[in-house]
């Protein structure tokens, strides 16, 4: 995933959290901030409680893969995905199903509707 698709700075994370638009399901929490931009930006948070670095990086890799696969259908907003306990036990298909479910609840993902603006 290109750097332009990532939320990295503490300032950006705080702006998203302070906007207080959040949605959750059993496996993920999403905070979002509506912004006028060409494409989405995402920040990932996986707690040390979920496992060692290998496990946490595997979770982040699965999440990024889902986002890359469905990037054309994601709205141009900033959002942070927080992984909850139990996500480390999911295989890729279950992770994808759970993540797309919470993205739909947050109105970030719309199936079959390309939303990325022309660059």
From Swiss-Prot:
SUPFAM superfamilies listed in its UniProt record: Ribosomal protein S5 domain 2-like (SSF54211)
GO CC, one annotated term: ribonuclease P complex
InterPro entries: Ribosomal_Su5_D2-typ_SF, Ribsml_uS5_D2-typ_fold_subgr, RNase_P
A Pfam family recorded for this sequence: Ribonuclease_P
E.C. code: 3.1.26.5
Single GO biological process annotation from the record: tRNA 5'-leader removal
Catalysed reactions, as listed in the record: Endonucleolytic cleavage of RNA, removing 5'-extranucleotides from tRNA precursor
Keyword field: Endonuclease, Hydrolase, Nuclease, RNA-binding, tRNA processing
Gene Ontology MF term list: 3'-tRNA processing endoribonuclease activity; ribonuclease P activity; tRNA binding
Matching PANTHER family: RIBONUCLEASE P PROTEIN COMPONENT
Function: RNaseP catalyzes the removal of the 5'-leader sequence from pre-tRNA to produce the mature 5'-terminus. It can also cleave other RNA substrates such as 4.5S RNA. The protein component plays an auxiliary but essential role in vivo by binding to the 5'-leader sequence and broadening the substrate specificity of the ribozyme.
Complexes and interactors: Consists of a catalytic RNA component (M1 or rnpB) and a protein subunit.
Family as reported in the entry's similarity comment: Belongs to the RnpA family.
Protein name as catalogued: Ribonuclease P protein component
Organism for this UniProt entry: Streptococcus gordonii (strain Challis / ATCC 35105 / BCRC 15272 / CH1 / DL1 / V288)
């Amino acid at each position: 995933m290109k750097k332009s698709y990532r939320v990295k700075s503490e300032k950006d994370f705080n702006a998203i959290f302070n906007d207080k638009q959040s949605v959750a399901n059993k496996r993920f929490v999403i905070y979002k901030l509506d912004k006028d931009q060409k494409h989405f930006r995402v920040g990932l948070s996986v707690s040390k409680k979920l496992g060692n670095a290998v496990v946490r990086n595997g979770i982040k890799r699965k999440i990024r893969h889902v986002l890359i696969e469905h990037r054309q259908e994601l709205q141009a907003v900033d959002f942070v995905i927080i992984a909850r306990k139990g996500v480390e036990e999911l295989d890729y298909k279950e992770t994808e199903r759970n993540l797309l479910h919470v993205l739909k609840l947050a109105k970030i993902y719309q199936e079959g509707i390309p939303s990325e603006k022309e660059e």
